[in-house]
UniProtKB/Swiss-Prot annotation:
One of its GO terms (molecular function) is proton-transporting ATP synthase activity, rotational mechanism. Signal peptide: none annotated. Its main location: cytoplasm. Keywords: ATP synthesis, ATP-binding, Bacterial flagellum biogenesis, Bacterial flagellum protein export, Cytoplasm, Hydrogen ion transport, Ion transport, Nucleotide-binding, Protein transport, Translocase, Transport. ATP binds at residues 167-174. The lineage of its organism: Bacteria, Pseudomonadati, Spirochaetota, Spirochaetia, Spirochaetales. It catalyses: ATP + H2O + 4 H(+)(in) = ADP + phosphate + 5 H(+)(out). This is Flagellum-specific ATP synthase. CDD domains: ATP-synt_flagellum-secretory_path_III_C (cd18114), ATP-synt_flagellum-secretory_path_III_N (cd18117), ATPase_flagellum-secretory_path_III (cd01136). PROSITE patterns: ATPASE_ALPHA_BETA (PS00152). Probable catalytic subunit of a protein translocase for flagellum-specific export, or a proton translocase involved in local circuits at the flagellum.
Amino acid sequence: MEADLLCKYEVALRESEPVKYVGHVTAVRGLLIESRGPHAVVGELCRIVLRRQGRPLIAEVVGLAGSTVKLMSYTDTHGVEVGCAVVAEGAALSVPVGDALLGRVLNAFGKAIDGKGEIYAPLRSEVLRASSNPMERLPITRQMVTGVRVLDSLLAVGCGQRLGIFSGSGVGKSTLMGMIARNTDADVSVIALIGERGREVMDFVAHDLGPEGLKRSVIVSATSDESPLARVRGAYTATAIAEYFRDQGKQVLLLFDSLTRFAKAQREIGLASGELPATRGYTPGVFETLPKLLERAGSFSMGSVTAFYTVLVDGDDLDEPISDAVRGIVDGHIVLSRALAQRNHYPAIDVLQSVSRLAHRVLGADMKEAVRIVRRALAVYAEVEDLVRVGAYQQGSDAELDRAIAMRAELERFLTQGAQERVRFQDTVTSLSMLTGLSIAQPPSGV
C-alpha cells in the first residue's frame, strides 16, 4: 500500500513543472505575434502578460521557426508590446461539455454569451481532435427526418450523412437551416454560426430557430468582427460539442453556417503565418483543413452526427474553389436557386442540381420509384419550359411531356413549404403517393 502511494507521488512529481519557461515578445506583425521562447508546440495555448493593462492575453501557437514562436491572439492585439512575457500553458484549447449546454448560446471558447449565467459542466473536451478510424464507421441505413418535405422525399438524408447547402447571399439558407433545426427528429442540434454579422445571430435565435428549437440546441457563435483564429476555433468547438453528444448515444444534427467564412478565416491565418496564396488567394492550408473538419461527422457505434454545411457561393459560381472542394468531400449537395427565390418559391431548392448520395440506402423501393417519377417529370418540363410558357408547345406532341405539364401545379405545391410549416413524415409519404399515383407500402428503412 505504501509503495503504491509513493509511486503515485513519484509519477506526479515527475510530470510536474515547478519551473515555468517564459518567453518574450519580439515583434507584432499585424495578426501575428512573434516571441523568443517559450518551449511550446503548435496548437498549444500561451498567456501573454500585458504590462500596462495588468491582464493576460490568450494566444495560440500557429508556427515555429527556430527559437521564434509565432502566436495568434484569440482577441485583438491591443496592448501587446515588445518585451511582454509569454508563458506556455501546456495544453490546447478545450471547452466544457454536458447537458448544461442545451438551450445556451456560446462563444468560440465555450463561454456563455446569452446573459443566462455561467455554464457549470464537469467535463471538458479538446476541440482539436483527429477524425475517427474509417473502419469504426457504421453503414448509413437509417433516415433522418428533417420536417422539410422536399428533403424527406426527393433528397432523403441518412443519419450520419454530410451535406453541403450551396447558395448565393439572400436566397434563404438561414431560413432553411432554421426549419431543419425546429422540425428534425434528431435528439440534439448543434448550430455553428461562423463569420456571421452580429445582428444575424440574434435574428436566427429569435426568428429562425425559435424557443422550441432552442430547447434542444446548442449554438456556437463567432461573428465576423472576431479574430480569424476565433472564427476557426468556433468551428472546431461546435464539432467537439456534437461529438460529445454523439458519444452519449445521441443522434446529433450539426448545422454549420458558413464553411466559406471558415475557409476565409483559415486563409487569413495562413497568409499571416507566411503561406503563399494559391487558387483565388486561398492558401494550401485551407484545402488541407476542410477534410479534417468535415470528416469528424458520421455514423458510429455510439451515435451519429448528421451535418449540413452551408457554402456561400461567390457570384453564384458553383465551380469556385471552396464549392468545388467541399462538393468532393460531402455525401451530397443541396443547391439553392436565386431564380426560384425570385419567384417566391421557398425553400428555393433546385432539385435537379441537388443530390443525396445515400438516398438509395435509406429509401424503400416504393419511395425510390416515386422519387424517380417526380425527378423525371421535373427534368422533362425543364427542357421545354420556355416553349410551354410562350405557347409554342402543342399539347399531344409528347405524352411524357403532357404528363409532366399536368403534374406541374401539384409539383409546385409539393416542393414549396412555409417557413413555420411543419410536415410530418407520414404526410410527406401520403402527398408523394397522391402526386405519383403509386401506393407506397412502407416508409424508408429506420423511420
